[in-house]
UniProtKB/Swiss-Prot annotation:
GO terms for biological process: translation. This is Small ribosomal subunit protein bS18. Keywords: Ribonucleoprotein, Ribosomal protein, RNA-binding, rRNA-binding. The lineage of its organism: Bacteria, Pseudomonadati, Pseudomonadota, Gammaproteobacteria, Methylococcales. The keyword Metal-binding does not apply. The gene is rpsR. One of its GO terms (molecular function) is structural constituent of ribosome. It comes from Methylococcus capsulatus (strain ATCC 33009 / NCIMB 11132 / Bath).
């Protein structure tokens, strides 16, 4: 059997030298929220633990201020 080489995911925020994640930067936050409105885990995105905590806090603040939805748009 041939082993598949899995590319190591890297932390985008570390590479760009971001100091703090802003809750008003909605374009960045939307990339880390799934279609159902859940925060995507760091094992999938490759985000480091420090920035994953900041990301979760920023997403929760944006949700509370109604900048991001809590869940997806339900069609009835």
């Amino acid at each position: 059997m041939v082993r598949q080489f899995k590319r190591r995911r890297y932390c985008r925020f570390t590479a760009e030298d971001v100091k703090e994640i802003d809750y008003k930067d909605l374009d960045t936050l939307r990339e880390y929220v799934s279609e159902t409105g859940k925060i995507v885990p760091s094992r999938i995105t490759g985000t480091s633990a420090k920035y994953q905590r900041q990301l979760a806090t920023a997403i929760k603040r944006a949700r509370f201020l109604a900048l991001l939805p809590f869940c997806d748009a339900h069609e009835q």
